[in-house]
Amino acid sequence: ITHLIVCTTSVDMPGADYQLTKLLGLRPYVKRYMMYQQGCFAGGTVLRLAKDLAENNKGARVLVVCSEVTAVTFRGPSDTHLDSLVGQALFGDGAAALIVGSDPVPEIEKPIFEMVWTAQTIAPDSEGAIDGHLREAGLTFHLLKDVPGIVSKNINKALVEAFEPLGISDYNSIFWIAHPGGPAILDQVEQKLALKPEKMKATREVLSEYGNMSSACVLFILDEMRKKSAQDGLKTTGEGLEWGVLFGFGPGLTIETVVLRSVTI
């Protein structure tokens, strides 16, 4: 491991990157990147950063870790912030890790997915849509009522930017790994793009089993999809399809897009 990226909502000094380096016995000169308080879009952010590091540092192997303790936002009901109850109902704790590299060593390294293209954007007129604040009361969480509408309104533009160069305009022909911010977001995205219900099956399965684990969610969904694809006897890790998309949505409102290519099983 040459590089380490850690993403978490917790705050310690030295950070979790230091603790992991010691715990795993990594070399003391491993290049560490610590990302705090990024929120739900950061599962895409860590992959984008890892891709850049792997492509621009020959032989790099990047360990990516997302560890989220969203229980720190839990508190009693507030008359002034009823929206906090939404997050408390949806959130869950979770951690996931993967390794990113380029030029895999034949017969030794077996990639599961290939990252082809990445992007990050701020949705127009979305300031204050999702907020988190670290205050005396702890980490507070607030969101506007129309977050699902903002996401669904902007997702088509992100898809066109990502897939037009590949000649893909049928979004039922690709596999989907979308951050499961909540059922309402998934419902509106499905409706906006006329997606078949099975497109979000892996995403909804993770939301149902574990809740919204912030940045860790999309990594859980990647794992869920590749395992289910193998169990069902499909040809690729992406539900038998070649191309797919990974979306992260979070504070900002920030949207992360990753174009994925599956691998033959």
UniProtKB/Swiss-Prot annotation:
Pathway(s) this gene product operates in, as recorded in its UniProt entry: Secondary metabolite biosynthesis; flavonoid biosynthesis
Active site per database record: 40
Alphabetized UniProt keyword annotations: Acyltransferase, Flavonoid biosynthesis, Transferase
GO biological process terms held by the UniProt record: flavonoid biosynthetic process; polyketide biosynthetic process
Matching SUPFAM superfamilies: Thiolase-like
Catalytic activity: (E)-4-coumaroyl-CoA + 3 malonyl-CoA + 3 H(+) = 2',4,4',6'-tetrahydroxychalcone + 3 CO2 + 4 CoA
EC number(s) on file: 2.3.1.74
Annotated Pfam families: Chal_sti_synt_C (PF02797), Chal_sti_synt_N (PF00195)
Record's function text: The primary product of this enzyme is 4,2',4',6'-tetrahydroxychalcone (also termed naringenin-chalcone or chalcone) which can under specific conditions spontaneously isomerize into naringenin.
Family recorded in the similarity comment: Belongs to the thiolase-like superfamily. Chalcone/stilbene synthases family.
PANTHER family reported for this sequence: CHALCONE SYNTHASE 7, HYDROXYMETHYLGLUTARYL-COA SYNTHASE
Name the record gives this protein: Chalcone synthase
The species this protein was found in: Medicago sativa
